Curated annotation (Swiss-Prot):
IF-3 binds to the 30S ribosomal subunit and shifts the equilibrium between 70S ribosomes and their 50S and 30S subunits in favor of the free subunits, thus enhancing the availability of 30S subunits on which protein synthesis initiation begins. Belongs to the IF-3 family. It is found in: Cytoplasm. Keywords: Cytoplasm, Initiation factor, Protein biosynthesis. GO terms for cellular component: cytosol; membrane. Residues 170-201 are annotated as: Disordered. GO terms for biological process: ribosome disassembly. It comes from Porphyromonas gingivalis (strain ATCC BAA-308 / W83). This is Translation initiation factor IF-3. Monomer. InterPro entries: T_IF-3_C_sf (IPR036788), T_IF-3_N_sf (IPR036787), Translation_initiation_fac_3 (IPR001288), Translation_initiation_fac_3_C (IPR019815), Translation_initiation_fac_3_N (IPR019814).
Length: 201
């Protein structure tokens, strides 16, 4: 059974055991009251006294309907969760001498990733003396970005970091309707790396 974290999160009415509180709410004169008077004001309106800021001095309490108060909290939490952006980054690796077959294979996967709403981090890995081909690697990544211009925009132009030259692409359109993106994480694309990679020294 799921636990309702919102329930019993706030002390209400008789459970509030302090000498005085700062009162807020609709149809009440805001200010500091002793706890008995604050409870009386809430009861006179057939509402609850809800402690919303226990660490304040004095604690802040709201005169409100507790059930509606909890409902609004849940609604707000649900809306915030729906608005949260979950970014998935797929990695695609090339060698400086990648052939057309391998290139097209990875291009196809990149299009699929972008259509799903994922970002694509493509990089050329230079092994040994293949670093001499860094200009060729840059040309390859720019060609990759150009071939994906209908699906993505360049977020980061090719940069060389150690033995890697990387470009970052972000999708132009939102995720496919009905697609539920996985949790935020950086995922290496195993499928895109299964093909043979030509990395000449």
């Amino acid at each position: 059974m799921a636990i309702d974290k919102t329930k019993n999160q706030h002390r209400i009415n008789e459970a509030i055991r302090v000498k005085e509180v700062r009162l807020v709410g609709d149809n009440v004169e805001q200010g500091v009251y002793n706890i008995q008077e604050a409870r009386r004001i809430a009861e006179s309106q057939d509402l609850d006294l809800v402690e919303i800021s226990p660490n304040a001095d004095p604690p802040v309490c709201r005169v409100t309907d507790y059930q509606k108060f909890v409902y609004q909290l849940k609604k707000k939490a649900k809306e915030q969760k729906a608005k949260s952006v979950k970014i998935v980054i797929k990695e695609i690796r090339f060698g400086p001498q990648t052939d057309d077959h391998d290139y097209n294979f990875k291009l196809k996967h990149a299009k699929e990733f972008l259509q799903e709403g994922s970002k694509v981090k493509a990089y050329v890995f230079f092994r040994g003396r293949s670093i001499l081909f860094k200009e060729q690697g840059e040309v390859l990544l720019l060609r990759f970005a150009n071939d994906l211009e209908d699906f993505a925009r360049v977020e980061q132009m090719p940069i060389l970091e150690g033995k890697r030259m990387t470009i970052m692409l972000t999708p132009k359109s939102a995720s496919k309707k009905g697609h539920t993106p996985p949790k935020t994480q950086v995922e290496a694309s195993k499928q895109a790396n299964e093909s043979a990679e030509t990395e000449e020294e």
